[in-house]
Amino acid sequence: MLAPIPEPKPGDLIEIFRPMYRHWAIYVGDGYVIHLAPPSEIAGAGAASIMSALTDKAIVKKELLCHVAGKDKYQVNNKHDEEYTPLPLSKIIQRAERLVGQEVLYRLTSENCEHFVNELRYGVPRSDQVRDAVKAVGIAGVGLAALGLVGVMLSRNKKQKQ
């Protein structure tokens, strides 16, 4: 049996499981979250994430968590609490609220929704999704290079036998 989803508390990071990526928001109380809304998030939950890669601006929005999540599952995920000390709750909420309505720079690789919420909670902008994607691309590149090398060696070996 699945454990119940813990009720978010103000300052908690909320991880929302979109079909192709994870969207992040920060819970500010009374059912509301503040999050970066690039075009893929403005269009509604589950919209194609490719739109996020094609823009350099996002709007900071305050919306009900149930509307932001839509039909997608979500969880409280303060995953860096052991590595970083969260900022005081009043500072987290104040900083988040002050940004609502502002248009901010958005870059999928360096200034995305995960960077945004980690900066609010810990004062450290970081995205594990980006780091993991870069690792995966690197590993795939090494794998492709190794396959290419094996192909060249097999081809040479076959020519030598002829």
Swiss-Prot record:
GO MF: N-acyltransferase activity; phospholipase A1 activity; phospholipase A2 activity; phospholipase activity
Keyword Endoplasmic reticulum annotated: yes
Phenotypic consequence of C113A: Abolishes enzyme activity
Keywords, sorted A to Z: Cell membrane, Cytoplasm, Endoplasmic reticulum, Hydrolase, Lipid degradation, Lipid metabolism, Lysosome, Membrane, Mitochondrion, Nucleus, Peroxisome, Transferase, Transmembrane, Transmembrane helix
Annotated phenotype, changing N112 to A/Q: Abolishes enzyme activity
One of the GO biological process terms: lipid catabolic process
Disruption phenotype: Mice display resistance to diet-induced obesity: they show strongly reduced adipose tissue mass and triglyceride content but normal adipogenesis accompanied by higher energy expenditure and increased fatty acid oxidation in adipocytes. Mice show resistance to infection by picornaviruses, such as coxsackievirus A10, probably due to reduced viral genome release into the host cytoplasm.
pH-related activity note: Optimum pH is 8.0.
Lumenal side of membrane: 155-162
InterPro entries, sorted: H-rev107_PLA/AT, LRAT_dom
Subcellular location: Cell membrane; Cytoplasm; Cytoplasm, Cytosol; Cytoplasm, Perinuclear region
GO cellular component: cytosol; endoplasmic reticulum; endoplasmic reticulum membrane; lysosomal membrane; lysosome; mitochondrial membrane; mitochondrion; nuclear envelope
Tissue spec: Ubiquitously expressed in normal tissues but down-regulated in primary carcinomas or in many cell lines derived from tumors. Highly expressed in white adipose tissue and in adipocytes. Expressed at lower levels in brown adipose tissue.
Catalytic activity: a 1,2-diacyl-sn-glycero-3-phosphocholine + H2O = a 1-acyl-sn-glycero-3-phosphocholine + a fatty acid + H(+); a 1,2-diacyl-sn-glycero-3-phosphocholine + H2O = a 2-acyl-sn-glycero-3-phosphocholine + a fatty acid + H(+); 1,2-dihexadecanoyl-sn-glycero-3-phosphocholine + H2O = 1-hexadecanoyl-sn-glycero-3-phosphocholine + hexadecanoate + H(+); 1,2-dihexadecanoyl-sn-glycero-3-phosphocholine + H2O = 2-hexadecanoyl-sn-glycero-3-phosphocholine + hexadecanoate + H(+)
Entry's family note: Belongs to the H-rev107 family.
Its job: Exhibits both phospholipase A1/2 and acyltransferase activities. Shows phospholipase A1 (PLA1) and A2 (PLA2), catalyzing the calcium-independent release of fatty acids from the sn-1 or sn-2 position of glycerophospholipids. For most substrates, PLA1 activity is much higher than PLA2 activity. Shows O-acyltransferase activity, catalyzing the transfer of a fatty acyl group from glycerophospholipid to the hydroxyl group of lysophospholipid.
Subunit and partners: Interacts with PPP2R1A; this interaction might decrease PP2A activity.
Domain characteristics, as noted in the entry: The C-terminal transmembrane domain is required for the targeting of the protein to damaged organelles.
Protein name: Phospholipase A and acyltransferase 3
